[in-house]
Amino acid sequence: MELLSRVLLWKLLLLQSSAVLSSGPSGTAAASSSLVSESVVSLAAGTQAVLRCQSPRMVWTQDRLHDRQRVVHWDLSGGPGSQRRRLVDMYSAGEQRVYEPRDRDRLLLSPSAFHDGNFSLLIRAVDRGDEGVYTCNLHHHYCHLDESLAVRLEVTEDPLLSRAYWDGEKEVLVVAHGAPALMTCINRAHVWTDRHLEEAQQVVHWDRQLPGVSHDRADRLLDLYASGERRAYGPPFLRDRVSVNTNAFARGDFSLRIDELERADEGIYSCHLHHHYCGLHERRVFHLQVTEPAFEPPARASPGNGSGHSSAPSPDPTLTRGHSIINVIVPEDHTHFFQQLGYVLATLLLFILLLITVVLATRYRHSGGCKTSDKKAGKSKGKDVNMVEFAVATRDQAPYRTEDIQLDYKNNILKERAELAHSPLPAKDVDLDKEFRKEYCK
């Protein structure tokens, strides 16, 4: 019995050396990029071209713990309808953890699994309860990788029936009851064994291939590194018009933008994504075609516009005027109405003030002339009244003056007064213009 167990163990070790879990591209396969997509883009000249190149696996998430966020776990499912349960798991920077108490010291994983790539599960003594499909699951959270391998375990009572074979989908292992069983899971890719360093692991570059030029002679346009470094190549007329987002590695969007397309920009553009640590090498190809910009044909020149046959016809404004649309915006509230009403009232008030000013100025001018006339008339009137009073006074004093005539005149003044008393009153001068002005001013 012991001899058969040793023979079975040696067979399992031989199977371990031959059964290797397939992984991502490595070695020479990693050097070549896999073509992900190829499309034709046709745009008009003068527009902006956007060549989409996106990949969530290229998002820069620096692993500060240097454990690469890797984990391996083994699961067991008893049959098609049974529920899968977790048996054991182990992180690259931690210890292995067994979930069921009965499986402790029975299920073993190699402590150096993340160094030598051997993630096989050893069961020391199998029993009937261990039958089922075992799944080896590898998860790389940093590189967004998930890989799995299934092994089916069958338990037999006859040690001579112990064997291992391939059923077309997975490995089948037949083990005698109480004998050890080794479920093989090997993956020696550097992404799981940490054989490569992290520096310069992410790089993106854009190439431009002119029509008729082979792929290996394409011109480099841009180089983008996860560290933030950027390098621009290509002809000057194109270098100033191409750009990629500054946060490309934070969003995983490396789309190329070309401003103001020209006919000389036609060609084959390729986006190359390389994540050397995670083994990502992808290529996306775009066939860019630049067409003539769409424009309206010029209208005929009218006969009376004076244009000759050699000059280009000018567009007729009446042709497009019939198809124009005039948008009239009517305010929904009464603010606009009150605003216009305020303008009208303010204008009317200014006009009234101006009219009042003119009337007052005219009245003031006329009142000044009337006062001047009144002053002159007053002086003349005063003189007339004095003369009348003086004449009346002289009449009253006539008897006395008659007596004085007989007397001897003392001086010339008395003589003149006497002559005036005996002489008739002078005619009163009447100024009709002054009288008319007095009546008008009243």
From Swiss-Prot:
Q: Which residues are glycosylated?
A: 118, 305
- Report motif location: RGD 1: 128-130
Ranges in the Extracellular compartment? 20-340
Give residues where Phosphoserine occurs. 227
Keywords for this protein: Cell adhesion, Cell junction, Cell membrane, Cell projection, Cytoplasm, Disulfide bond, Glycoprotein, Immunoglobulin domain, Membrane, Nucleus, Phosphoprotein, Repeat, Signal, Tight junction, Transmembrane, Transmembrane helix
* Disulfide cysteine pairs (residue numbers): 53-136, 185-271
Where found? Answer: Cell membrane; Cell junction, Tight junction; Cytoplasm; Cell projection, Cilium membrane
GO CC entries: bicellular tight junction; cell surface; ciliary membrane; cytoplasm; nucleus
A Pfam family of this chain: V-set
Residues of the Ig-like V-type domain: 25-156, 159-291
Record note on what altering residue 130 to E does: No significant effect on integrin ITGAV:ITGB3 binding
Entry's transmembrane regions: 341-361
Q: Please give the residue ranges the record annotates as the region Disordered.
A: 296-319
Give a yes or no for keyword Hydrolase in this entry. no
Q: For side Cytoplasmic, which residue ranges? A: 362-442
Q: Where is this motif: RGD 2?
A: 251-253
Induction, as annotated? Disruption of the blood-brain barrier by cold injury results in a drastic reduction in expression. Up-regulated in primary chondrocytes in response to BMP2 and PTHLH/PTHrP.
What positions are marked as the site Cleavage? 324-325
Known partners and oligomeric status: Homodimer in cis. Does not appear to form trans-homodimers. Interacts with ITGB3; the interaction inhibits ITGAV:ITGB3 heterodimer formation.
Entry domain remark:
RGD motif 2 (but not RGD motif 1) is involved in integrin ITGAV:ITGB3 binding.
**What is the role of this chain?**
Transmembrane protein which can modulate activity of various signaling pathways, probably via binding to integrin ITGAV:ITGB3. Mediates heterophilic cell-cell interactions in vitro. Inhibits osteoclastogenesis downstream of TNFSF11/RANKL and CSF1, where it may function by attenuating signaling via integrin ITGB3 and MAP kinase p38. Plays a role in cartilage formation where it promotes proliferation and maturation of growth plate chondrocytes. Stimulates formation of primary cilia in chondrocytes.
Q: What is this protein identified as?
A: Matrix remodeling-associated protein 8
Q: Which organism is it from?
A: Mus musculus
Show the taxonomic lineage. Eukaryota, Metazoa, Chordata, Craniata, Vertebrata
